[in-house]
Amino acid sequence: MTAWRAAGITYIQYSNIAARILRESLKTGLRADAAKRDASHVKFTPWANGKPAQRQTQSES
């Protein structure tokens, strides 16, 4: 059994923890570059009555 399964977490949770620890261990200059790559953007279009409503953009850093 893998360590992350034995700990009772999913692979995604394990991967996120490992990535966070790696980013925290970087030197200051490299840490800033890694933080820029960490941002994500999601476009979401809700539908009402069979037609798309106003598009929404979500940004997370």
Curated annotation (Swiss-Prot):
Disruption phenotype: Embryonic lethal. Heterozygotes show increased lifespan and enhanced resistance to oxidative stress. ATP levels are normal. Gene3D superfamilies: ATP synthase, F1 complex, epsilon subunit superfamily, mitochondrial. GO terms for molecular function: G protein-coupled receptor binding; proton-transporting ATP synthase activity, rotational mechanism. Residues 3-15 are annotated as: Sufficient for mth activation. GO terms for cellular component: extracellular space; mitochondrial inner membrane; proton-transporting ATP synthase complex. Changing W4A: Abolishes ability to activate mth. InterPro entries: ATP_synth_F1_esu_mt (IPR006721), ATP_synth_F1_esu_sf_mt (IPR036742). GO terms for biological process: determination of adult lifespan; positive regulation of G protein-coupled receptor signaling pathway; proton motive force-driven ATP synthesis; proton motive force-driven mitochondrial ATP synthesis; proton transmembrane transport; response to oxidative stress. PANTHER family: ATP SYNTHASE EPSILON CHAIN, MITOCHONDRIAL, ATP SYNTHASE SUBUNIT EPSILON, MITOCHONDRIAL. Belongs to the eukaryotic ATPase epsilon family. Activates the G-protein coupled receptor mth in vitro, leading to increased intracellular calcium ion levels. This is Protein stunted. It comes from Drosophila melanogaster. The lineage of its organism: Eukaryota, Metazoa, Ecdysozoa, Arthropoda, Hexapoda.
